[in-house]
Amino acid sequence: MALKIRLARAGSKKRPYYHVVVADVRAPRDGRFIETVGSWNPVLLKDAERVKLDAERIQHWIAQGAQPTDRVLRFLDQAGIAKRPSRNNPTKGEPGKKAQERLALAKQAEEEAAAKAAEAAAAAAAPAEEAASE
């Protein structure tokens, strides 16, 4: 039986409240669960009562093989119960192929314009030097 430590929604409409529960992965989100090990009230902002966790029971269930979901793992990391590895994906922020092609074309056009401007400046300076030497 695969176990997850996950959130089960409670509360009324537009007033969410979540229980942190240990449940079988096949059970419905708000359905059958094995044990409640905490709660999360997202309505409370920056409050000590916002997230309540039973650290001892959570560690017990993790030792039994229960896997916390990403959101619960964030709570456990903040509480110092479990370590959440950082998700660093530097390639995700890079532009796509088409955008890179457009950037390369724009850079090439800019370099050509700079080269033409340098040639024009050199050509304008050359006749002035010839006139000065005569």
From Swiss-Prot:
GO cellular component: cytoplasm; small ribosomal subunit
Recorded family membership: Belongs to the bacterial ribosomal protein bS16 family.
Any GO BP annotation: translation
Region (Disordered) residue spans: 79-134
PANTHER family referenced in this protein's UniProt entry, alphabetically: 30S RIBOSOMAL PROTEIN S16, SMALL RIBOSOMAL SUBUNIT PROTEIN BS16M
SUPFAM superfamilies listed in its UniProt record: Ribosomal protein S16 (SSF54565)
Protein name (record): Small ribosomal subunit protein bS16
Pfam families for the chain: Ribosomal_S16
NCBIfam families, A to Z: S16
Keywords for the protein's UniProt record, in alphabetical order: Ribonucleoprotein, Ribosomal protein
Segments of skewed composition (Low complexity): 115-134
Highest taxon, organism lineage: Bacteria
GO MF: structural constituent of ribosome
